[in-house]
Amino acid sequence: MKFFLLFLVVLPIMGVLGKKNGYAVDSKGKAPECFLSNYCNNECTKVHYADKGYCCLLSCYCFGLNDDKKVLEISDTTKKYCDFTIIN
């Protein structure tokens, strides 16, 4: 019974924390190109419904995308670089 109650408490939290980061792609499989972070923030939040976005390596990198959104496959090094850059 305790396990079941714990499961009911943890399940909604996992849904909230289940967001991902990456280059969101359109229907053609292309990530938006950019030079300015403000453009990417608008693109990510209004078009892809992410929490925020910025320009990383000339493409819009979005934070807080829903799990059902498609993202561009990138190397772990690029992902770590873009994740690290926004923190600092």
UniProtKB/Swiss-Prot annotation:
It is found in: Secreted. Residues 20-83 form the LCN-type CS-alpha/beta domain. Residues 1-18 form the signal peptide. The keyword Cytoplasm does not apply. Keywords: Disulfide bond, Ion channel impairing toxin, Neurotoxin, Secreted, Signal, Toxin, Voltage-gated sodium channel impairing toxin. SMART domains: Knot1. This is Beta-insect excitatory toxin LqhIT1b. The lineage of its organism: Eukaryota, Metazoa, Ecdysozoa, Arthropoda, Chelicerata. InterPro entries: LCN-type_CS_alpha_beta_dom, Scorpion_toxin-like, Scorpion_toxin-like_sf, Scorpion_toxinL/defensin. Excitatory insect toxins induce a spastic paralysis. They bind voltage-independently at site-4 of sodium channels (Nav) and shift the voltage of activation toward more negative potentials thereby affecting sodium channel activation and promoting spontaneous and repetitive firing. GO terms for biological process: defense response. Expressed by the venom gland. Pfam families: Toxin_3.
